[in-house]
Amino acid sequence: MATVLSRALKLPGKKSPDLGEYDPLTQADSDESEDDLVLNLQQKNGGVKNGKSALGDLPEPDSDADVAGAAKPHLSEVTPEGFPSEPLGGLEQKATSPLVSYVRTSVFLLTLVISMVLVLLCAFLIPCPPRDLHSAWSRRLGSQGGGDLSPLELADVNRDGLRDVLLTFVTTRNGTEGGVGSQPTADLVCLSGMNGSTLWSSPLPEEAQDVTCLDLIPGSVAKTICLVTGTRKMLSAFNATSGKVLWTLNPNHLSNGTLAAPVVVLPDLDEDGVRDLVVLAIGELQPDLCFLLVSGRTGSPVGRPVKYNIVGVGNLIGPQVYITASGAVYILFGFGNIQAVALRDIFVQAQNRDSSPPSLQIEEPEWEKHRSVNLSELIDVYSDGVELLQLVKAPDSNSSSLLITTRQGLVLLRGQDLTPHWKLNLQGLRSQPTPGYFTDDQTLDFLLQTQDGDGMKKMTVVDGGSGSIVWSYSIPCHMKETPTTSAITSDQKSVFLFWAEALTAASLSSDDSSGAEPPGLYHLYLLHPAFPSILLDLSNTTGIVTASEVGINDIWKDAFYVTRTTGMSPEGHPTSLVVSKLSLRWALMEGQMVQLKETTPKIGRGELRRFLSRIKFVDSPYQI
């Protein structure tokens, strides 16, 4: 208050004392904060300095007000040192910040909504792969009216990711004309791999000996074609999706013989973009063997028939196509022996010309050395009581090895030079060996079944690298021939499947093959290389198993086992035909463990189940 009174008494225009002198009123003004508040109120209310408005002209530099202002700046005008003063537009920026935040939030929510809509559209427009919900199904196709052959093929005909089942069978239908009686008819049927329902059916003019489904146009997404070879003169191509006939070979081209073996697929010979075919016909006399090249696009012959006079004793071998590492193409065939003829020679004779396509002009020097006579077209491959011939993948090579089943045992020939890799003497071997991976050397091994006394069979696994026996066991089985199959897992091991009668505790501990169950009940057993002392009992049937195939569900890494069984009448004739499917991953969890022998440490069921639950199956062909 003293400061206010002192300033009020001062006359206008009077000079203030010298700044160097001590003024108690001025000193009190600088020490008391209350006076600062009063001055602030005066300035806000438009107070007058030296008779002038605060917004008017600047006061004189030597006025008392300037001296006081210089001694003590106004608090609202003080700017801390090191901090810039706020621009005048700061209020406008603060006012627009809520709008920016609103825009950002709106953009984020809009992006989120669009992403959710796209995800939902993809979920509805792109269907999920169908899951094979049927772990097992069985389909009865009625009474079978004869027929000794049991063709069975797996192919995905409806493009749903699951392989379907194709088979042919003979049925008996009543005659329509006075007392003619019943007459057999053949049918080609396609069953859904999902549930066993019939996708399509097509009649056949005769019984079929083989059904093969493949794509004749390499590297394309064309429709799958099924080639059906009859027992006499029929060769037809079917659209696997619809079951319609695409073409049929004119039987007049086989007037001098009948089809002796299933059709064989060749490279493209007529350069129309579709792989071609060859069939082997046999006349009434054995030496008359005839090769006929057939167009894969139209079913018309590619040239005239080519005849060879072959004399031999034993089973008909082949024909099979062998492509060497250098690209030379040979046809393997024979009677009780194996001979080869270059596809180039067949093509030149069929076309009646001297030249051949460049792809057929390649020769394999090691094979050419085995020609029986100079300038002869036939190459001697093997001639010692041949029963069966298989082409199997050779390790570390882009060619195949020749696995030959003879009356004396088993022989593996190297495909490069036709020299024996190993031989195994084994009597009683009649069925085809089943390839698979049992050992750890990534070389194909083979499961064999041989006769081992009355009502007994011995199952044997042979090492494909050395020809030595690595596993064997005798099982009770009264069926003469039972199919064996295998499936490869993701860790490059194979599971082997075979049929036998019940392996009870009594039959395991003694040589007596009679068990508690009747001999007409057969069980499906699985052998895994990781547990050679254990078999898994997966399923059983009372019928006669005539054919079986293993397919792979690539989407779910599962394998399924398809069987074709027939019942028997009291007179011994086949009756009803049944097709069954079994999911292997499901069966592994539900199967019963059969301990062949005691091991140390003992294998528990929990340990086995944990191991089996991790098994995944993959598609990897053993034969090429």
Curated annotation (Swiss-Prot):
The modification Phosphothreonine is found at residue 26. Signal peptide: none annotated. The modification Phosphoserine is found at residues 16, 30, 33, 63. It is found in: Membrane; Golgi outpost; Cytoplasm, Cytoskeleton, Microtubule organizing center. It is a single-pass membrane protein. It comes from the Eukaryota. Residues 1-91 are annotated as: Disordered. Keywords: Cytoplasm, Cytoskeleton, Golgi apparatus, Membrane, Phosphoprotein, Transmembrane, Transmembrane helix. Pfam families: Beta-prop_FAM234A_B. The chain crosses the membrane at residues 107-127. GO terms for cellular component: Golgi apparatus; membrane; microtubule organizing center. Belongs to the FAM234 family. This is Protein FAM234B. It comes from Mus musculus (Mouse). The lineage of its organism: Eukaryota, Metazoa, Chordata, Craniata, Vertebrata. The gene is Fam234b.
